[in-house]
From Swiss-Prot:
The enzyme's E.C. designation: 1.6.5.-, 1.7.1.17
Keyword presence, NAD: yes
GO molecular function terms noted in the UniProt entry: electron transfer activity; FMN binding; oxidoreductase activity, acting on NAD(P)H as acceptor; oxidoreductase activity, acting on NAD(P)H, quinone or similar compound as acceptor
Function, as annotated: Quinone reductase that provides resistance to thiol-specific stress caused by electrophilic quinones.
Cofactor binding remark: Binds 1 FMN per subunit.
Top EC category: oxidoreductase
Protein name per its UniProtKB record: FMN-dependent NADH:quinone oxidoreductase 1
Cofactor(s) the protein needs: FMN
Binding site for FMN: 17-19
Gene coding for it: azoR1
Lineage: Bacteria, Bacillati, Bacillota, Bacilli, Bacillales
InterPro entries linked: Flavodoxin_fold, Flavoprotein-like_sf, FMN-dep_NADH:Q_OxRdtase_AzoR1, NADH:quinone_OxRdtase_FMN_depd
Length: 208
């Protein structure tokens, strides 16, 4: 059985969020097209995601070094490792997220920090880091109200680019993508822009 992890990185309802609308469309179509797959949903706005602070970092580093952790270090390290284990156990992963203030929501950033662990998702070598997660299929569903694919705001796009770079660091270099942009910049075209993205998400879900 194929294990599929759906990650939603937006707490708004679908009628107020294009990325959540894409998520729900993709999820519904995927379940319809792949009825035998084991689907797990992770809502990062409902999940327990402690801030990636010095105590958590210390605990994770002590684990690698084989040192004794304090109770709080162990508690936080266990949380991070729990999310990482879930990520690594999935055969396919779908991530839906917006561009907020040129970046990604803080909850999503924290989650990605949990995953970025040497010896688990990548390893250091004399020639630089090498990704260790090369066996996963990834779909990225990204929405941004402005135009960031080209033009004066291109260099400000640090949501999709950031996530793609993190995944490439893990060894996942060719994710599937559905990008919806410009629906706020071009309100007269918003309905058509969002409709086209929804159709693209549904079609990708069928073959993902």
């Amino acid at each position: 059985m194929t294990n599929v992890l759906f990650i939603k990185a937006n707490g708004l309802p679908a009628e107020r969020s294009v990325s959540v609308a894409l998520y729900e469309i993709f999820l519904a179509e995927y379940k319809k097209s792949h009825p035998d797959d084991n689907v797990t949903e992770l809502d990062l706005f409902e999940a327990d995601l402690p801030y990636y602070d010095v105590t958590m970092m210390s605990g994770l580093h002590k684990e690698v070094a084989g040192e004794t952790l304090t109770p709080e270090e162990k508690r936080l390290a266990d949380i991070a490792n729990g999310y990482l284990d879930q990520f690594l156990a999935a055969d396919k992963i779908v991530m839906a997220f917006p561009l907020w203030n040129f970046s990604i929501p803080a909850q999503f950033l924290t989650y990605l920090f949990y995953l970025n662990q040497a010896g688990k998702t990548f390893k250091y070598t004399a020639n630089g880091p090498i990704g260790l997660v090369t066996d996963k299929k990834i779909a990225l569903l990204n929405a941004r109200g402005g135009i960031y694919s080209d033009g004066p705001l291109q260099s400000f796009e640090m949501s999709l680019n950031y996530v793609k770079n993190v995944l490439a660091h893990f060894g996942i270099s060719e994710p599937e993508m559905v990008i919806v942009e410009g629906h706020n910049a071009k309100p007269d075209q918003a309905k058509d822009i969002i409709s086209a993205g929804a159709k693209e998400a549904a079609e990708l879900a069928k073959i993902f």
